Amino acid sequence: MKHILLLLLSFFVPVVWGQQVEQFKLWPDKPEAGEAEIFVYHPAKGGKAAPAVLICPGGGYRGLAMNHEGHDMAKWYASNGFVAVVLKYRMPEGVHTIPLSDAEKAMSVIRGNAAKWNLDANKVGVIGSSAGGHLAASLSTLAADANRPDFAILYYPVISFDNMTTHGGSK
């Protein structure tokens, strides 16, 4: 049993260790927005320009599930040929446009680095889970055209803040 487990692990370790991760502040010239940042996971294989995804973790707009809805997802997408970008967005704290402005800025940074990161600027999507799904849907419908994603994947998104349809943790 131990040999089988070690054999299986030997297939997954190079995938995780082979990924390059870069970290960037979204608003380096604005100290008050200092916590907004992105983590960029590059696919192991080079070659033609890759599609990209901006990943918006959930957390009820009170915090962020950065590991299982962010970094773990990014590792999987990067291992499957995507440039995967995890967004650590700011909490709204009464100003509901703050997370959306961070997501729009992230899309601008991704497309602006298309050549450097070897990604296809016409194949940039957004992924969101829970409250991050709400943010991804908002980005897909409300963002300026230049910052609008080409596709969206919503995992158990919050689609309404109506008392009858939204769980209490997302209000």
What are these regions (language model features)?
Residues 65-72, 85-121:
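Catalytic nucleophile-loop/oxyanion-hole region of alpha/beta-hydrolase
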Residues 49-59:
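Short beta-strand element of the alpha/beta-hydrolase
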Residues 105-170:
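Primarily recognizes the serine-hydrolase "nucleophile elbow" in alpha/beta-hydrolase
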Residues 1-21:
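Bacterial Sec-dependent N-terminal signal peptides
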Residues 62-64, 162-163:
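Glycine/Thr-rich phosphate-binding loops of Rossmann-like dinucleotide-binding domains
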Residues 58, 82, 89-91, 157:
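Active-site loop/turn elements of alpha/beta-hydrolase fold enzymes
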Residues 52, 78-85, 125, 151:
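A fold-wide structural signal in alpha/beta-hydrolase
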Residues 18-51, 96, 100, 166-167:
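N-terminal cap/lid segment of alpha/beta-hydrolase-fold proteins
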